[in-house]
């Protein structure tokens, strides 16, 4: 399903979205902005929507069923389980302010590499994946309204695609086979040091609501209202 178009006052994330080349649609788990406080003003850089495969609900219910939104939001292990869960995730990052592809890729990968090296996890495979990631972004320039699309497969394949607006193409993208990078990109958004606390709160609230409705008989596919992020 195509996303509604971005306009000057808001970025809209529809209740469902189909990742490029995916067999099915995913539901909107949460959305929020990434920004920073500068001179007493909160400057918004991007709006981020995180979509989850329907299988996420029963998978997360085993451990997190019955938890409130506040309990989920305050527990880093919950977000880690979303990142590493055996279900597909789809992330749409829409620009509010302009940014070059090189700037975006450098910021994402420098944090990943620093963490991996500190944890003794950095290998030649990660080095190759990081270079491929940077090469994908190198020729890109993101004007306000352009989107970066990440599909995170449970097998550890990160697919990167781009859109000139907030729509999602039916196919296309570059696949990077590296589980650590696949998880790290989403971890950088909703992890313990994630860049979008607003998206984390939104995700915790929505998943808590869905888990409360989850039954052993399996509920219908989850639905959500569109989320509008003021730019």
From Swiss-Prot:
Q: Alphabetically list the UniProt keywords.
A: Flavonoid biosynthesis, Isomerase
Binding positions (substrate):
46, 111, 188
GO MF: chalcone isomerase activity
The catalytic activity, as recorded, is: a chalcone = a flavanone
- Which pathway does it serve? Secondary metabolite biosynthesis; flavonoid biosynthesis
Enzyme Commission no: 5.5.1.6
Q: Where is this site: Important for catalytic activity?
A: 104
List the InterPro entries hit by this protein, alphabetically: CFI, Chalcone_isomerase, Chalcone_isomerase_3-sand, Chalcone_isomerase_bundle_sf, Chalcone_isomerase_sf
UniProt-listed SUPFAM superfamilies: Chalcone isomerase
Gene3D superfamilies for the chain: 1.10.890.20, 3.50.70.10
Indicate the secretion signal residues. Answer: none
Q: In which tissues is it expressed?
A: Pericarp.
Q: Which GO terms describe its biological process?
A: flavonoid biosynthetic process
Keyword Iron carried by entry:
no
What is the role of the protein in this entry? Catalyzes the intramolecular cyclization of bicyclic chalcones into tricyclic (S)-flavanones. Responsible for the isomerization of 4,2',4',6'-tetrahydroxychalcone (also termed chalcone) into naringenin.
More details: Part of the biosynthetic pathway for all classes of flavonoids, a large class of secondary plant metabolites, many of which are brightly colored.
By sequence similarity, the record places it as follows:
Belongs to the chalcone isomerase family.
Protein name stated in the entry: Chalcone--flavanone isomerase
Q: What organism does this protein naturally occur in? A: Zea mays (Maize)
